[in-house]
């Protein structure tokens, strides 16, 4: 994603041909969503504890996000579109919506251009938690196929952003979302299984309403993203013997074929302007490329990966948050005017990557790691203060529907309501 926003294709003599047939942004985010779908439900189920899962997520994401916002606001001049928090004229609405990380489905500008993917992550977390507390979490295949099928049939007819088409409607929607999210978290962090289930179903219900009725992106793209995430979960379950492999390949195959068909049917005739790529060919090749990369990584999962790659994985979240603000900060000093010779282009690329990786490492080392450690301490304190109650309620599968079951084995807007930003729903 860093190289995509850096504009690496513009520096290559054949970059235009690549752009016509392949979108690095869509490739990157779909690969990211596949990985997330594979990892996140496994993390929740290994813990077998909704509260522990959410404490870990909150301390994993929010400190780095807040620090990245603070650093970016200090670095960037007013008017720079990559960071818009406190710069929209509706600062309270913007802050509240971005605090929930649902802003991209609340008709509110993303506080940072790249954080639209965090909205999809948060919605996925809500859905996964709701399914888990009902004992429906192993129905990943059915859910993935359902999302893909709805995208196929209704991808060009369902309207997006239907709940908030004015500033007043947006304000009301944000207030409602904040209240629901706060109530949901209070319940999920209580340690009481019945309350945890109520909280999980509250936020999962909100997630479903937003993704079907108020997505900023075209509906076919939104639904395909969630089909992809749950397909990632299907692969995890097949790998660990929780579902039949034939069923898994059928489900995943349907999602992949649907993604290509969706691109051909809907991502053309001007619609590609809203998905930020050149058309259905680039859409389809990028989507299938993400799947091919993920499956190749799965085949190599038992191999020992080089340390530089594992290190890059560790700092990837910080790099994702910082790479655009850093680019906008250093480009006027190091690449103005833009380099024209091959040597100068190479030097500029190396300089940008080096600065970005150093900054990402510092954010990871100084913010991410300490707050993850603090999160573990906070969880222990919560468990001492509010011990988890016994699991209750009917359900299916090994969880019995409880909020703490036994663990299983092992990123067109209405005028005046939003401010345009650089990153679109397929650019990361």
Feature locations, PLM:
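Functionally critical transmembrane alpha-helices in membrane proteins and complexes, commonly lining
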Residues: 1-44, 59-65, 69, 289-293, ...
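Membrane-interface helix-loop-helix regions
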Residues: 15, 61-126, 139, 149-163, ...
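Alpha-helical transmembrane segments of multi-pass integral membrane proteins
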Residues: 26, 221-237, 249-369
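Transmembrane alpha-helical segments and their boundary/interface "anchor" motifs
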Residues: 26-30, 43-82, 89-97, 124-125, ...
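Membrane-interface junctions at the ends of membrane-embedded or membrane-associated helices
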Residues: 43-52, 134-142, 191, 236-249, ...
């Amino acid at each position: 994603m860093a190289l995509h926003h850096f504009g690496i294709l513009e520096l290559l003599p054949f970059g235009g041909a690549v752009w016509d047939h392949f979108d690095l942004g869509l490739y990157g985010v779909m690969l990211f969503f596949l990985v997330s779908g594979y990892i996140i439900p496994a993390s929740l189920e290994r813990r077998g504890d909704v509260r522990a899962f959410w404490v870990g997520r909150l301390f994993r994401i929010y400190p780095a996000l807040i620090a990245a916002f603070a650093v970016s606001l200090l670095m960037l001049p007013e008017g720079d579109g990559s960071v818009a928090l406190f710069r929209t004229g509706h600062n309270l609405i913007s802050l509240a919506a971005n605090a929930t990380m649902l802003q991209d489905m609340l008709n509110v500008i993303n506080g940072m251009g790249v954080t639209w993917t965090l909205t999809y992550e948060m919605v996925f977390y809500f859905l996964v938690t709701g399914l888990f507390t009902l004992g429906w979490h192993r129905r990943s295949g059915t859910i993935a196929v359902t999302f893909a099928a709805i995208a196929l049939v209704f991808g060009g007819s369902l309207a997006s952003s239907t709940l908030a088409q004015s500033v007043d409607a947006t304000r009301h929607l944000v207030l409602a979302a904040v209240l629901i999210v706060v109530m949901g978290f209070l319940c999920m962090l209580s340690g009481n299984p019945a309350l945890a289930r109520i909280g999980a179903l509250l936020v999962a219900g909100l997630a479903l309403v937003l993704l079907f009725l108020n997505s900023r992106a075209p509906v076919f793209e939104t639904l395909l993203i969630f089909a992809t995430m749950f397909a990632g979960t299907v692969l995890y379950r097949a790998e660990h013997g929780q579902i039949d492999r034939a069923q898994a390949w059928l489900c995943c195959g349907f999602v992949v074929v649907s993604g290509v068909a969706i691109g051909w049917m809907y991502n053309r005739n001007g619609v590609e302007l809203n998905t930020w790529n050149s058309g259905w060919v680039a859409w389809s090749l990028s989507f299938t490329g993400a799947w091919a990369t993920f499956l190749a990584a799965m085949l190599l999962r038992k191999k020992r990966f080089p340390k530089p790659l594992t290190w890059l994985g560790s700092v990837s979240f910080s790099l994702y948050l910082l790479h655009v603000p850093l680019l906008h900060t250093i480009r006027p000093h190091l690449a103005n005017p833009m380099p024209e010779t091959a040597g100068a282009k190479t030097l500029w690329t190396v300089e940008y990557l080096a600065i970005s990786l150093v900054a990402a490492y510092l954010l990871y080392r100084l913010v991410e790691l300490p707050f993850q450690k603090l999160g573990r301490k906070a969880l222990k304190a919560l468990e001492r203060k509010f011990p988890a109650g016994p699991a209750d309620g009917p359900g299916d599968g090994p969880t019995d529907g409880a909020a703490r079951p036994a663990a299983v084995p092992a990123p067109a807007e209405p005028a005046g309501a939003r401010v345009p930003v650089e990153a679109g729903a397929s650019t990361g």
